Structures are given as C-alpha cells and as structure tokens.
Amino acid sequence: MTHFLRSDKKPEGHKLEDLLVQLRADIIHRCDVIAGDTRPEALQVMANNMKILCHLSDAITLALDSTRILDRSFGPSQAAQGGPPRIGKTDAA
C-alpha cells in the first residue's frame, strides 16, 4: 500500500506530479525566507536547495511524461474512483 500516492487501495491519494509541485513550492518559499542571509551556512543551504529544485523540476517533467503516456495509451486514470491500475498488478492487501 502506498502512503501518499493514489492506488486502487488508496483512491484518495495524490498524483506524483502534484506532490512534487507542492514540494517544490515549499522549497521555493524556504529559499525566499533565507535569501538575504549571507552567513556561510545559509549560503550553503541555499546552494543545496537550488540543486534540489533542479532535480525536482526534472522529476516533475518525468512524472508528467509518465502520466501523458498512460493517458494516451490507456485513457484517464480511474484510481480516484477506486478503479484498477492502468499498468501492473493491483495492490496487495
């Protein structure tokens, strides 16, 4: 069973790209808070956050691409209504 992502056992779960976009927004907010701090620690944290943001943006692009592939090949997901997965097996109990 998934903790956050939508599945046949968790129809109220989230789409991966939605979680990644939310996480990216949170990190951008955190960056805004520390942007004026010029201490070495803050500068390093900001540099780390910028790298993380790049990786998150790449992950969002990949997640959106996967959704487009599945939508094009199998139609819209019915997971939110408790439908079966479009690929793979159903979740084990």
Regions found by a protein language model. Give the residues of each.
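N-terminal acidic leader/helix
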Residues: 1-34
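Short intrinsically disordered terminal tails
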Residues: 1-4, 76, 80-93
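General helical secondary-structure elements
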Residues: 2, 20, 26, 47, ...
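Intrinsic disorder/low-complexity segments enriched in polar/small residues
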Residues: 10-13, 45, 59, 79-82, ...
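Short, charge-rich amphipathic interface segments used for partner binding and complex assembly
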Residues: 32-79
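Intrinsic disorder/low-complexity signature
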Residues: 5, 23, 29, 45-46, ...
